Structures are given as C-alpha cells and as structure tokens.
Amino acid sequence: MLLERLGKELLYFDGGMGTLLQSKGLQPGELPEVWNLEHAEEIIDIHKAYFEAGSDIVLSNTFGANAIKFHDSKYGLKEIVTAGIQNAKKAAERGVHDGRKTYVALDVGPTGKLLKPMGDLSFEDAYDAFKETMIYGEQAGADLIHIETMSDSYEVKAAVLAAKENTSLPVFATMIFDEKGKLLTGGDVPAVVTMLEGLRVDALGINCGMGPEQMLPILEDILKYASVPIIVKPNAGLPKQRDGEVYYDVEPEQFAGYMAKIVEMGAHVIGGCCGTTPAHIQKMVETTREMSVKPATKKDITMVSSYGHAVILGGKPMIIGERINPTGKKKFKQALKDHDMDYILKEGITQQDKGAHILDVNVGLPDIDEPAMMKELIMALQIVSSLPLQIDTVDITAMEAAMRIYNGKPMVNSVNGKQENMDAVFPLIKRYGGVVIGLTIDEDGIPATADGRVRVAGKIIEEAKKYGIDKKDIVIDVLAMTISSEPEGAKVTLEALKKVREIYGVCTVLGVSNISFGLPYRPAVNSNFYTMAMQNGLSAGIINPSSEDMMRSYYSFCALMNYDKNCEEYIRVYGSQKAGTPAPAAKAELTLKEAIEKGLKEEAHHATGELLKKQAPLEIINEHLIPALDTVGKGFEKGTVFLPQLLMSADAAKIAFAVIKDVLAQEGGEVQAKNKVILATVKGDIHDIGKNIVKVLLENYSFDVIDLGKDVPPEVIVDTAVEQDIRLVGLSALMTTTVVSMEETIKLLRERKPECKVMVGGAVLNQDYADMIGADFYGKDAMQSVYYAQRVFGEE
C-alpha cells in the first residue's frame, strides 16, 4: 500500500523527537530510547500529536537503538525496538480519527563509529549491528525502515544491505550534508544518489544539519540525478537559546512556506527534523495538502561512483586505467605475491595523476587468494584515491566479495552472453548495484561480424531486464580483436561499436590495446585506433594513462570535439611543452612530501630514511613533514582532498615521525611534544567520529592529545583540565539532546579554569550556537581545530 502511494501523492513524515523529550524531562546523558519502556505514555503522546497534526508516517523512538550502543544496556535491544514500534502503533490507534492510512517507520540512525579503513568498525560488524535492529523492527510490526542522518556512505550501505537482506520492508534512506553538499566522509550528492539507487532503496533524500532554506540547493542537485521518490526533512532553522532553553529560529508558518517550495521543486515525502514540532508539521500539512506532487522521473544516466564522487559515462569519453593488472607485468605479479601494497597503490595514484577517471582492478594470479586480495586492495585503493573502481575478475566469489565491501557503485568487468555467466553475475548487480560491462561473446564464441556482436549485446540487455537491471547500468564491450591475426578486426569492432550505440543507446567500452598484439611499435596503432573508436561512439577506453601517445590522442580528440571547453585541459597538459620535446620521465621515487600527500606509508618510511642521511631530524619535520600536512589540510578545506585521504596522509606522517623519533632517541634527543589538548565527547553522547578525526590531526601536528573518550561528565573534563593545567579543551556533540551537557561543561570550566579556551564541534552546532553556549571557537571541520590550537599556543 505504501509503495503504491509513494511518488504519486504527497506523504508526510513527523518532526523532531529530541527537543520534545527534553521538554518532558529527558536528562543529559539519559538515553532517549529507554523512554520507550520507562516513559511509554510520554512517547505515545508525542507520536499521537504528530498523527493528529497530519503525519502519514511516524518514526519509532529508536534512532540510536543498535547492538553497538545497547550492548551493555539494562534493557535488551529487542525490548527497546519492540517497545518503540508498539508505542507508535498505539499512538496511531489513539490519534488517527479520519480513517486515513498511516504507517510506523523503524527509525535507524548511525552507530556513532567510523568504519574501517578510516575507523575501527568493520563493515560486517556495522552490518550485523543494523541487522539485529531491522529484524526486531519487522517482527514488532514496522511498516517500513527509515535510515536517516547518515554522514558516511559506507555506513549507510551497511544499513541498507542489512535491511534489504533481512526484511521484506520498504527502505528509505536520508543523508546529512553540509552547506557545500558534502558528507562528513567527503561524498557529494551524485555519488550518494548513484550508490543508494544501485542498492535499490525505495526513496532517498536529505535530513538534519540545516534549515529548509539551506536545503534548497542540495535538493536541486538531488533532483538532477535521482529516479526514485525524494525525501526532505529539514531542521527548524538554527538552534538558539532563550531563558536557558534551546529553540530553533524558523517558526511553523515560515517552515511551511519553505516546505511548499520544496514540494514545488519535486519532493515526494516531507517532514521535519531537529527543532520541528507538531505545530510545524500541522502548518506544513495545511499549507501543502492541496498541492500536486511531481512524479519521480527516470534519469537515463550511466553513472559509477566512489565514496567521493560520481563519473558519468555517455558524454565526454572517460579513461579507465588498466595498470592494476598482473597480465604481462613481472613487477606487479611479484608485488601481489609479496603483498607489496604500496607498489600497487602507487600504480593507482600514478594513473589518477595522469588523467584516469576510473581504475580497473584485477588481481587474478595463480596461488593468490583472489577474493581476499581483491577485498583488501579495493579497501586500500579507496583510501588513497577518490576515483571509482572497476572490479575486474572472472571469479564470481571474488566479484561478490569486492562488490559487497565497495564504497560506492562500481563498474564490474564483466558479464558475457553465456546463460550460465549471466545467471551468476546479474543477481550480484541487482543486489549490490553496479554498472556491468557486457562482453559480446556467448556459447558460440565471439561473432565474426558486427551484426553478430550487436545481437549478443541485445541478448545481454534483454536478459538484464528480467532482473530489473536497466540498460543504463550496462556498458557493452564489442571486443577489440588483434589485427595481426584478424585483418578485418578493427573495422568489425568500429562498426559494431557504432551500431550498439545507435540501436540500443547504451554506453560502450573497449580494451583498446588488444588491437595491436603481435605488432611492432604498438603505441602508434593503439593511439590511432583509440581516436577512431572515440569517433565511433566509445564511451570509455581501458588504456594506460601513462602512455603519451594514448593521452595525446585523448586530449586532442576532446579538444577537437569540444568536450574540452576552450581547450582548457589541453592547454593545461601541453601548454608548457614545446613541439618535439618528449614528456618528462616519471620519477622512480617519491619525495617525503609527495609520499605523505598521497598517503603511502612505506614510501614515507623510505623517503624519511633517505632524508636523514643528509638533513637533521628537526629540519625534516619543519621543512618536509609539516608543509606536507598543511598542503593536505588545505586541500581538505577546499574539497579537493577527502577524509579517507586526509587520514591516510596522517598515517603516513606518523610513520615518518616514528622514524625520526627513533633516530633522535639513538642520538639522545627527542621530539618535544607541543602543548596538551583535551578532547571529549560530552555526557550523554556516544558519537565520537568527529572527535577521533580531530585527535589524529592534532597528534600529527605534535600536540599532546588527552582523549577522555565519549559520554564524559563535565566534572571529569574540568578536573583533568585543572590537574593537567590545560589551556585548550575540545568538546564534541552530535545530538541536540546533548548540547546542554556541552554548555554545562563550558560553564564549569569558566568557574574553575577561566583562562582555558574551549573549541566545540558537531553536526548540531553552528557559530551562533557556539557563541551562545560560551565557546571560544567553533570548528566547522577537523582542520579548523588544528588552526585554532596553533593560534592558542602562538604557533601561527
């Protein structure tokens, strides 16, 4: 019933829960979900008020109910979730009197932990934590699952899979973006939409973090890419304080006006988040009830994504880097056998630097545990590179293992026209999402004619439809056959390429260098064939981006066909190169600064050792290490460096520091730690992702961080500050209900150690609110904490 209404009529969620619970007596540090059992009538009253205000869907009070947060609670997770669903259902019975159909959604929030490789929580452990909640929610009678306030695309993938694989309920998912349209972990709107649609959520969107006005540009971006119905749940503006109470500055009537604009733009499910009340929802419903909803429109865009950004195929030709593949590469084979990850990662980084848009990943080698190696390499590559990856394997087990842990929507290389192969691959594409390469080969082999290959392409496309896989998620490879053995091979390939684009309207890909096997001076043949293929409709070429011949063909073609506006890219690459001058050779080794910027730990270790032969340890720190960290930090602020890369660079810097410290210890010296800083997540809040990121960065700038952990009472923070004579304290809070604890901590610090400075951060905070609670500094991102610490200790 819900899915029949979704996208065809406007549906209404409820509003905020936390601030209403505070008004009813929820104390700082008290878990809101426990009220499902200890104050059930209060919870039922809140739900009832939302139903009476016009909500079609009410969220259970289970935002933080997962196995990680409730592992040592006095109540079992099943008790909490069951009570949460039952309370909402009782409220529907009491609060809905007009006969309309209403729904109870199992509300699922983040775990509060950062997933590996950035944090310490494994993907499968996150999945298991969500899985329990999902199962209990369905058993208790939930009508749908709403995953919300997610700031990490990897965590939301774990949650969506847990819901899809363990329940039969509809799944909604909403993310929390910043004002730049980015997740905490760096993902942008196209990347998030691409991944969530690949995972087949029933609706997606945005919630929390900002008011309705600030959400308008993000919604506009979502509308460009989303084919499924869209959810929008803003806060009631910005948090303020009045007479010691927190309130939000967008009143119900103003909120309703913005929500009408949001419906006009194309939202299908609307509601409220922090600070919104039944009054906000009632006014929103009254204002928009007669508005017609725009139907969700299918977007025929072929997109793949990493955690950070999406790549669109079908317009400007894309480059798929081919070098992470052992075929014909002795050093690469040895690196796989020796588990030399830095060598392999360096191949990926080099291709990214040379202009690749997607990286092919193939680890097929005898005596290698391919599924395990593929998983490890995929995770490692996604830290050092923000490019989407192409999972290249004929091993179905390895393919599934990689697709499951991949953070984004990958390209998958490949499926072919053999029924057995399609039966194995298409279920994985349906389950995990991906753009799959279809090879035009079937039980009869590779057709000799263009029409034969077009026929196999059609067979693959039709079979995919049976699994609900749209043709936008299929890229056809008509196969480049070597002309040394098949003289008509190039002509047949180019003809098939053109026909596939014209007849089926799908994107295409080729392993370009296959055309020249067995010939002398292969780059000449490859580069000319590459140009011909692009002219005939090639969407993406699997090539070596380090080949000057291939890249010259690529940049020239893009400039000539006006894919490169004003020839800007061509001029950037070749503007300083004189005719007839060969391109500079690639360096064999990276400098320490380069190794840190690229997050290569072994390279950083080696480069530090080499520098120590000619420079003093402290000179290396000041002239190489700190400038490298500054470069990465500035890139993070600008959005050109993503959180995984920031943390990987920090790890590489740690390795370099360790080498330097060892040398100093042998010489009887030491690296003097800088001043001490306390970090803590305040009482009642167990979300410490942001705090942990700040800790890593401060330590890399040699600050001595005292990490008091999470759910820390004000007295503990202040006692430590006094005992240790601390000059700077950093406080973190994610939830509206715990910002009160932050204010209490600051007040106590002002009483007992007034000279101590306080910096605050968290999703529910902003500069105005930081000022109101008495903080000295608001950190909108992790790097800001470093700059402020430097200012406090006079290091700027």
Predicted regions and their residues:
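Domain-level signal for soluble alpha/beta catalytic cores
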Residues: 1-475, 481-796
